[in-house]
């Protein structure tokens, strides 16, 4: 997988990695390599982040969980290039080969959340929105949300509008 693609995948899923040590397997991201490509999944009990990308070369179907701290380091090492990252798995370790750098991390063992069941397959509802406006609205409403409290952002989708609200100990936000 290209370095910039892996970097983007990590950046778009790492926020949902749990910091709760009572479920150690969720303190990392699940990597799934199958006929669809590479899928990364992270969960923390409140959020689920998923990113899927096609991959050129794959040697079978397999999955493993990489600790969030290791992925943070991989993200820092990856550059904005199309050079390919080699990902190799062993019985207890994962090896990332990024250019001339090799990072070896232990695998997290345990039963990862059944994430496929958490996402509806045939949802008839489709939403089309202006990405810039949507992200700006999320940024405004999220100003009072702290990473520590992880207050949910509630979206109510109506005809021609999306109503976003959140309630935290600091106050309420609505847009």
Where in this protein do the model-derived segments appear?
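DNA polymerase processivity clamps
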Residues: 1-52, 56-108, 122-175
């Amino acid at each position: 997988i290209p370095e910039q693609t892996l970097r983007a995948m990590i950046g778009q899923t790492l926020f949902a990695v749990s910091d709760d040590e009572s479920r150690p397997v969720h303190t990392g991201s699940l990597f799934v390599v199958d006929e669809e490509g590479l899928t990364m999944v992270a969960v923390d009990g409140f959020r689920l982040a998923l990113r899927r990308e096609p991959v050129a070369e794959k040697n079978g179907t397999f999955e493993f969980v990489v600790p969030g701290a290791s992925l943070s380091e991989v993200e820092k090492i990856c550059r904005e290039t199309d050079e390919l990252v080699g990902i190799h798995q062993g019985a207890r370790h994962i090896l990332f080969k990024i250019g001339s750098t090799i990072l070896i991390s232990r695998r997290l063992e345990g039963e990862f959340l059944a994430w496929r069941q958490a996402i509806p397959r045939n949802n008839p509802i489709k939403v089309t929105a202006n990405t810039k406006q949507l992200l700006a609205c999320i940024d405004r409403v999220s100003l009072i949300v702290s990473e520590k409290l992880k207050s949910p952002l509630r979206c109510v989708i109506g005809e021609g509008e999306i109503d976003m609200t959140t309630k935290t100990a600091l106050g309420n936000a609505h847009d």
